Structures are given as structure tokens and as C-alpha cells.
């Protein structure tokens, strides 16, 4: 068994949709990034890649590559899952935390877990998404951006 940890952060900007966990969340701003800037899925990708000792998301999907401009991070997650499988691992579970002041995410958490489960071929019972605030402290508390943390457990597929 191996554990992978991922972290990502993106700044809020006007004129972009807010996509978290593969779900469009109504908000007056979205996140800045080369892809759809889904900070949660990026943290999961990094956790998966780290657990399999395959580097990080920037190595596999660089922001200098025009193929990834505006791409759905669900596609990046699916490609990451395939890389992890080819390395001889399968995902046991995923646990995540989003850190932001607003918007409130309670109505969207279940859909995020479903999207992540679909992209990783995991049952929803093996995917956990949480959201918290920083009590108005720091960049997240000032509503300047969103941070995400992810932990994954990988099992060897016995190769």
C-alpha cells in the first residue's frame, strides 16, 4: 500500500466559471488557470501521481502545452488514473478538503463525490469531499482564492 498527498491553490478571477470536483458551482468569479482550474481535481491528480511515485501534475500536463488549454480536469484525472494503473496500482480511497470562504459548497458536495467516483472508477463510498473556511483568515478568508488538499490510498495490483 502507498499513500499519496496532493495540494493545489488557484486565485479567483472574474469572467470564468467556478468548477470544483467536476461540478460548476454558481459564483461571481471562477479560478485562474490554464485548464478549467479545478483545484480539487488537481490536488487529487497530484496525490495519485505522488502515491505512485510518478511526479506531479505539472510534469504530465504542463501549462505550457496548448493541448491542455481550457481542458476539463475530469479528463486530466482520468488520464492520471490510467497512468497510476499502468504503474501497477489501483485506488482504494480518496479523501479531500476544499478551503474557501465563499461560496458555501454543501449543496454540491455529493455531486462532486459522484463525479470523482465516475472519473476514478470508485464507488462514492470510497470518495470523500469536505469543505471548510479559514474563519476569514489568509487568502482564502479574504476570498482571493481556493485551496484543496487530497490524500489517496493506493494498493498494488499484484503485478
Curated annotation (Swiss-Prot):
UniProt cofactor note:
Binds 1 divalent metal cation per subunit.
Residues bound to 4-CDP-2-C-methyl-D-erythritol 2-phosphate are: 8-10, 34-35, 56-58, 61-65, 132-135, 139, 142
Entry binding sites for a divalent metal cation: 8, 10, 42
Entry annotated with the keyword Protein biosynthesis: no
- Gene Ontology molecular functions: 2-C-methyl-D-erythritol 2,4-cyclodiphosphate synthase activity; metal ion binding
| Pathway participation | Isoprenoid biosynthesis; isopentenyl diphosphate biosynthesis via DXP pathway; isopentenyl diphosphate from 1-deoxy-D-xylulose 5-phosphate: step 4/6
Q: Which reaction does it catalyse?
A: 4-CDP-2-C-methyl-D-erythritol 2-phosphate = 2-C-methyl-D-erythritol 2,4-cyclic diphosphate + CMP
CDD domains in alphabetical order: MECDP_synthase (cd00554)
Give the keywords, sorted. Isoprene biosynthesis, Lyase, Metal-binding
Enzyme class, UniProt record, top EC level: lyase
Q: Which cofactor does it need?
A: a divalent metal cation
Residues the record marks as site: Transition state stabilizer: 34, 133
GO BP: any one term? isopentenyl diphosphate biosynthetic process, methylerythritol 4-phosphate pathway
Q: Which domain of life is it from?
A: Bacteria
Q: Where is the signal peptide?
A: none
Q: Does the keyword Metal-binding apply?
A: yes
Q: What is its EC number?
A: 4.6.1.12
This chain's function reads: Involved in the biosynthesis of isopentenyl diphosphate (IPP) and dimethylallyl diphosphate (DMAPP), two major building blocks of isoprenoid compounds. Catalyzes the conversion of 4-diphosphocytidyl-2-C-methyl-D-erythritol 2-phosphate (CDP-ME2P) to 2-C-methyl-D-erythritol 2,4-cyclodiphosphate (ME-CPP) with a corresponding release of cytidine 5-monophosphate (CMP).
Its family?
Answer: Belongs to the IspF family.
Q: How does it assemble?
A: Homotrimer.
By what name is this protein known? 2-C-methyl-D-erythritol 2,4-cyclodiphosphate synthase
What is the protein's species of origin? Syntrophobacter fumaroxidans (strain DSM 10017 / MPOB)
Amino acid at each position: 500500500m502507498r499513500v499519496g498527498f496532493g495540494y493545489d491553490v488557484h486565485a479567483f478571477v472574474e469572467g470564468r466559471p467556478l468548477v470544483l470536483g467536476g461540478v460548476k458551482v454558481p459564483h461571481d468569479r471562477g479560478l485562474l488557470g490554464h485548464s478549467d482550474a479545478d483545484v480539487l481535481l488537481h490536488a487529487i491528480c497530484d496525490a495519485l501521481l505522488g502515491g505512485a511515485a510518478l511526479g506531479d501534475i505539472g510534469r504530465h500536463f504542463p501549462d505550457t502545452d496548448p493541448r491542455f488549454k481550457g481542458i476539463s480536469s475530469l479528463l486530466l484525472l482520468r488520464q492520471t488514473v490510467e497512468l497510476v494503473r499502468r504503474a501497477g496500482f489501483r485506488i482504494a480511497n480518496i479523501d479531500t478538503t476544499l478551503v474557501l470562504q465563499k461560496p458555501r459548497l454543501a449543496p454540491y458536495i455529493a455531486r462532486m463525490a459522484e463525479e470523482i467516483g465516475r472519473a476514478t472508477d470508485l464507488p462514492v463510498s470510497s470518495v470523500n469531499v469536505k469543505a471548510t473556511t479559514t474563519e476569514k483568515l489568509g487568502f482564502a478568508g479574504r476570498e482571493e482564492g481556493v485551496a484543496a488538499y487530497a490524500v489517496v490510498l493506493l494498493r498494488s495490483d499484484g503485478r
